[in-house]
Amino acid sequence: MSEIEKYHWVFRIHVVDRAGALTSIASAFSNEGINIGTVVGHGLEEPALVEGSVVLTFFSSEEKKDIMVRKIQRLSKVIRLEERPYDSHSLRKSAILHTTRKLKPLDVAGENSFLTCELVGSEIEGFTYFLAGSPSELDPVLHKLEKNGVVKDIVYSILGL
């Protein structure tokens, strides 16, 4: 029996009210046996007329992804859903890195584009950087830094454009 090919997907889900929206979205994924890789919420701290959004990543077959599109769109708090493959050029990924040493320009050079790299702070324990770029450019840089033992800690998110 051949294994079904899984792809990396990104959903940006626009919601009316974030209270309970994330729970219902996570439940829909859990019911289908799909693990959410990354989840980021965007909204305002004070109640407003502006919609919030939830951006998440996951791996699944195209068929399961289509099932999730239909399930998520039917949720009462969902206004609309945007779906993209993880390697879409319209997506951007950002990361906050705690490193063991100061980064050099070659440490953060993408293969086909420049990445944003900003030194946020330095302390005795190391350095803190903000990095951003397309996932296809940023991921190899992050993996290289991790492999070389430069990364102490990392927090990242996906932002749909």
Model region roles, listed by residue range:
Residues 1-9, 14-51, 59-161:
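Long, contiguous binding/interaction regions
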